[in-house]
Design a protein with these regions (language model features):
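A short, charge-rich alpha-helical start-of-domain segment used by transcription regulators
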Residues: 1-26, 36-39, 118
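Arg/Lys-rich amphipathic alpha helix in sigma70-family domain 2
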Residues: 67-88, 99-102, 158
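Helix-turn-helix DNA-binding module
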Residues: 111, 115, 127-144
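Conserved RNAP core-binding helix
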Residues: 25, 35-52
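Σ70-family region 2.3-2.4 aromatic/basic alpha-helix that recognizes the −10 promoter
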Residues: 43-47, 59-79, 149
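DNA-recognition helix of helix-turn-helix
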Residues: 70, 138-162
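Short amphipathic alpha-helical boundary/capping segments
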Residues: 15, 105-113
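A short pre-motif secondary-structure segment
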Residues: 120-124
C-alpha cells in the first residue's frame, strides 16, 4: 500500500490534476483573495494528494484534495500573526482607486467575512456542496454550517450595492 505509485496510478493522478486544478485554484483564490497564495495552496494540496494517492477512493479525489486545501488554508490562517485587517484595507484601497468587476467585488466582500463564514460560503455556494458535505469538509456540525451561511449571507447582503440603471 505504501511505496512509489505505479505507472497506472501516476496516469490516474495526472488525469485528476488536469481535470481538478482549475476548480481547486478558483476555490483557493476565493478562500484567500490572493492569486499567488492560492497557487501555493493548490500546489501543496496536490502534493499531499499525490502522496496519499493509493488511499484516495476513486471518484472522491476532488473532495479529498479540496479538504486538504481548506485545511491548509485554516492552518495558514491560524499561524498568521494578528494584524489589522490588511485584506480589507487592501480591498478598500483597490475599490477606491478603480472600478472593480463583479468577481473582484465578490472577493472583496468575501474578504470582510470572518474566516469560518467565508469558508462556508465558498464551499456551500461556490462549490455547490450540500450542508452535510461542507460540515464534513470543515469538521463542524450541519447546524454550524447553517448558522455561518445565514450570518455570512446577511453580511454580504448589507455590503452589496446593485449597479444602477436597472428596471427598478
Amino acid at each position: 500500500m505504501f511505496g512509489p505509485p505505479t505507472p497506472r496510478q501516476d496516469a490516474e493522478y495526472t488525469a485528476f490534476v488536469l481535470s481538478a486544478s482549475s476548480s481547486l485554484t478558483r476555490t483557493a483564490w476565493l478562500l484567500t483573495g490572493d492569486s499567488d497564495l492560492a497557487a501555493e495552496l493548490v500546489q501543496e494540496a496536490l502534493v499531499k494528494t499525490y502522496l496519499a494517492w493509493r488511499r484516495v477512493r476513486h471518484g472522491e479525489a476532488t473532495a479529498y484534495a479540496r479538504r486538504i486545501l481548506v485545511n491548509l488554508n485554516i492552518d495558514r490562517w491560524r499561524r498568521r500573526p494578528a494584524t489589522p485587517s490588511e485584506e480589507l484595507d487592501r480591498a478598500v484601497l483597490n475599490g477606491a482607486e478603480q472600478a472593480v468587476d463583479d468577481r473582484d467585488e465578490v472577493a472583496r466582500m468575501l474578504a470582510t467575512l470572518p474566516q469560518q463564514q467565508r469558508r462556508v460560503i465558498v464551499l456551500r455556494y461556490y462549490n455547490d456542496l450540500s450542508e452535510a458535505d461542507v460540515a464534513g469538509h470543515l469538521g463542524i456540525s450541519v447546524g454550524a454550517v447553517k448558522s455561518a451561511a445565514s450570518r455570512g449571507l446577511a453580511t454580504l447582503r448589507t455590503q452589496y450595492t446593485p449597479v444602477s440603471g436597472g428596471g427598478q
